[in-house]
Amino acid sequence: MLETVVIVFHLLGALGVVALVLLQQGKGADAGASFGAGASNTVFGGQGTSTFLSKFTAILAACFFITSLGLGYFAKEKAQQLTQVGLPDPAVLEVKQKPAADDVPVLEGQKPAAVPADVPQAPEKK
């Protein structure tokens, strides 16, 4: 239940940040005025909407980061619950190695290696 509430706030925060960034005026551009930002300078004071929108964007971005951390915590808790359900812990599992093949065919005229090695030996010259 709490995870669903955090997801809803996370999505609302993400959409809000996107909308506020698109509404803000860029340097030397009046794109925000087409959405009403230019006409509402008197509502938000003498400085206009730039400080209001930038502060509100910063607040929404901080909320977005906090909900991201919360969702990460919920994901970690859910992963820990899944390992406790009955699945074996991968760190505890033993890896069984196959026994060395003793029935490898040997060519006539060659003698088998005395000690098995990882690096192949060069044939002896007669």
UniProtKB/Swiss-Prot annotation:
Residue spans of biased composition, Low complexity class: 112-126
GO biological process terms, semicolon-separated: intracellular protein transmembrane transport; protein secretion; protein transport by the Sec complex
Family stated for the protein in its record: Belongs to the SecG family.
Main location: membrane
GO cellular component: plasma membrane
Keyword field contains Membrane: yes
Keywords: Cell inner membrane, Cell membrane, Membrane, Protein transport, Translocation, Transmembrane, Transmembrane helix, Transport
Origin species: Pseudomonas syringae pv. syringae (strain B728a)
Function, as annotated: Involved in protein export. Participates in an early event of protein translocation.
One of the record's GO molecular function terms: protein-transporting ATPase activity
Protein name: Protein-export membrane protein SecG
